[in-house]
Amino acid sequence: MNFYVDVLGCPKNEADCALLKAYLEKKGNNIVNTIEDADAVVIDTCGFILEAKKESIEEILTYLELKKERDLKVYVTGCLVQRYGEELKKEIPEVDGWFGILPPEKIAENIGKESIIPKNPEPVYEFGGRVDEKQYAYVKISDGCDRACSFCTIPLFKGSFKSRKIDDIVKEVEYLILSGKKEIILVAQDTTGYGIDLYGKQMLPELLKRINDIPGDFWIRVMYMHPDHITDEIIEAFSYDKVLKYFDIPVQHGSDKVLKLMNRTKKSEHILKLVEKIRKRYEDAVLRTSIIVGFPGETDEDFEELLDFIKMVRFERLGAFIYSDEEEAPSYHFEGKVPEIVAQERLDILMEEQSKISFEINEKMVGKTFKVLFDEEEEGVLIARSYMDAPEIDGNIFVPGKFEEGFFKVKVTSADVYDLEGKIVEE
């Protein structure tokens, strides 16, 4: 059977589906790159916030419309199924199979046979091959979460924090490097917690050392580091030559009152000291963060504190979102809900401020030369990234040329708010 795999949501889903594709192939199936060539589709869904849930449902319904026109099997997996599986089965009976959070191998074994929605998620898997199309690959080092952020429902459907064995992760990365991957992106709900459940201590520094020791010319990028648990040892581990000086630290807010309501255990002063420590250690550090605006109880004064915080830190990369009121999250019951129109205004103001910061930073890049990877080519223009940018969520460097694999040197010739333009230069 020809399978098309449609990945929605976060990079952790991409990591899961890379393995799922390999297991489907082991069962004698083919993986195709377009739905037109497929006999079956697997949709890996997101169930985190309202917009993601809407997107997942719309995608399912789109494929079911195709199913009316031709012979097409539709299978759905991922967080949305784990969270709402029984309800979905009743509401959308046309789907051929539902699979909650399971090891990819188990999904491949049961697809076409029976639906499986486990009472307790089973997210941790052992490496068994994978199929990737890009020069970069997401590698999931743990799943689930033991944090108790008041806005978040992930622990409810992902379960408690569970780390993969370090040898298995290294084995997967070795496979990826041998297959030609040039960027390894480590993902988890909180990468700083890696290893605590298995080894009794934070093992991210040891994992980075083990991966850094693998022969080859490649990058290591770390995503999703909780600011409360970034130790000096973790910061020092970024000194390994293959580890990018890219610190993805979702701080969520800059007001101490709002941080407390979010059940974040540290205050903004801790974050400021952490940022200072990182920038003192690495002059070329790039800091990325995520912000939630419109959290219940967020006043105009709190938002002004957030703006002042952003102006003070000057994050190189920032993503911001309006609070999503999830019925199973503790914050759902909080008073002081912010009207949507006010939350949108605050988001617009925040992003306008960040756009100024981003443009000022980008202007300083003009004339500099960076080592880059090309992600794709569109009409003779290459979409490149330096160490400063993660795939899909950050900016790009647009370069004239034809796609080639491997690393290249690009000199920046002009800057925009979030993106750069450049030209290939000789080594």
UniProtKB/Swiss-Prot annotation:
Residues annotated as domain Radical SAM core: 131-360
Cofactor: [4Fe-4S] cluster
Compartments, as annotated in UniProt: Cytoplasm
Role played: Catalyzes the methylthiolation of an aspartic acid residue of ribosomal protein uS12.
Pfam families membership: Radical_SAM, TRAM_2, UPF0004
Cofactor binding description: Binds 2 [4Fe-4S] clusters. One cluster is coordinated with 3 cysteines and an exchangeable S-adenosyl-L-methionine.
GO cellular component, one term: cytosol
Record HAMAP family: MTTase_RimO (MF_01865)
This protein's record includes keyword Cytoplasm: yes
Highest taxon in the source lineage: Bacteria
TRAM domain span: 363-426
Cited PANTHER family: RIBOSOMAL PROTEIN S12 METHYLTHIOTRANSFERASE RIMO, RIBOSOMAL PROTEIN US12 METHYLTHIOTRANSFERASE RIMO
Family: Belongs to the methylthiotransferase family. RimO subfamily.
GO BP annotations, alphabetical order: tRNA modification
Species this chain originates from: Thermosipho africanus (strain TCF52B)
Any coiled-coil regions, as ranges: none
Signal sequence annotation: none
UniProt entry tagged with the keyword Acetylation: no
UniProt-recorded name of the protein: Ribosomal protein uS12 methylthiotransferase RimO
